Amino acid sequence: MAATGEALTPQGYIQHHLTNLSVGEGFWTWHIDSLLFSVGLGVLFLWIFRSVGKKATTGVPGKLQCFVEMIVEFVDNSVKETFHGRNALIAPLALTIFVWVFMMNFMDMVPVDWLPHTAAMLGVPYLKVVPTTDLNITFSLALGVFLLIIYYSIKVKGVSGFVKELTLQPFNHWAMIPVNLLLESVTLIAKPISLALRLFGNLYAGELIFILIALMYGANWLIASLGVTLQLGWLIFHILVITLQAFIFMMLTIVYLSMAHEDH
C-alpha cells in the first residue's frame, strides 16, 4: 500500500513496487534505496570475508569458512581457466563482482511486500530493495568494468598499440581505418551496455513476476492457492537465475579484461 494508507489498484500496486525512493530531479536524481542496499551489501560482503580470513585455521574449518573457501576456490579456478595474462588483481576483482552481484540479486528472494510495507509504516513512501533492478546500479558496475578495459588496454599495449587495435583491425589496411574504427568502437562500447542490460533485464523481469504473483493473493482462495504454488516454483527457478547472472557478469568481466591484456 502507499504511504497514505489508501488501497492500491493492481496497476498502482505494480507501479509502487517498481518505484525507487528518490531525491533530486532529472539527471541529478539519486535513488537512495538502491544506493543504501548496494553499499550495505558490499560492506556486508567485505566484513564476512575479512572476518573469515582473520579467523581461518589450518585445522578443521567451520561451516562458514568452508563455504567461503569453496567460493574463493571456484572463482580462482574460473580466473585461471579464462584469464591468460598476469595480474594479481583479477581474481579479487572477480570474487568481488561475483559475490556482490549475487548478494544484490538475492534481495529478490525477500517477499515483495515485507520491506516496502515496513518502510511505509515508518513513513517511507517507496522502497525498491533489489539494486540490480535499477539501471543506474547495473550501468555503474558495467562502467567500472569498461574503465578497467580501457586502462589495461593502454597499460599493456601502450597508447599507440591501443589506437592501432581500434584502427587496423579487422582489416589491416590504411584505407579501411574509418571502417575499422567504427566497427571496433561499436564492439568496445557494446561490452558495458550488454553487461548492464543483461543483468538489469533478467532481474527486473524476475522482480516483476514476483509482484504479479503477489497480486494473486488478493483474489479468491482458489487463485491465492495457485499463487502459492507459482511463487514456490518461481522462487526455486529464480535462485538459479540470480546465481547464473552473477556468474555471467563475472565471467564476461574476466574475458574482457583478458582480451585487454592480449598484446597483438
Curated annotation (Swiss-Prot):
Protein localization: Cell inner membrane
Record key words, sorted: ATP synthesis, Cell inner membrane, Cell membrane, CF(0), Hydrogen ion transport, Ion transport, Membrane, Transmembrane, Transmembrane helix, Transport
Main location: membrane
Stretches that traverse the bilayer: 29-49, 87-107, 134-154, 177-197, 208-228, 235-255
GO biological process entries: proton motive force-driven plasma membrane ATP synthesis
Domain of life: Bacteria
Bilayer topology term: Multi-pass membrane protein
One Pfam family it belongs to: ATP-synt_A
Molecular function via GO: proton-transporting ATP synthase activity, rotational mechanism
InterPro entries named among the record's database cross-references: ATP_syn_F0_a_bact/chloroplast, ATP_synth_F0_asu, ATP_synth_F0_asu_AS, F0_ATP_A_sf
GO cellular component, one term: plasma membrane
Its biological purpose: Key component of the proton channel; it plays a direct role in the translocation of protons across the membrane.
Family note: Belongs to the ATPase A chain family.
Subunit structure: F-type ATPases have 2 components, CF(1) - the catalytic core - and CF(0) - the membrane proton channel. CF(1) has five subunits: alpha(3), beta(3), gamma(1), delta(1), epsilon(1). CF(0) has three main subunits: a(1), b(2) and c(9-12). The alpha and beta chains form an alternating ring which encloses part of the gamma chain. CF(1) is attached to CF(0) by a central stalk formed by the gamma and epsilon chains, while a peripheral stalk is formed by the delta and b chains.
Protein name as catalogued: ATP synthase subunit a
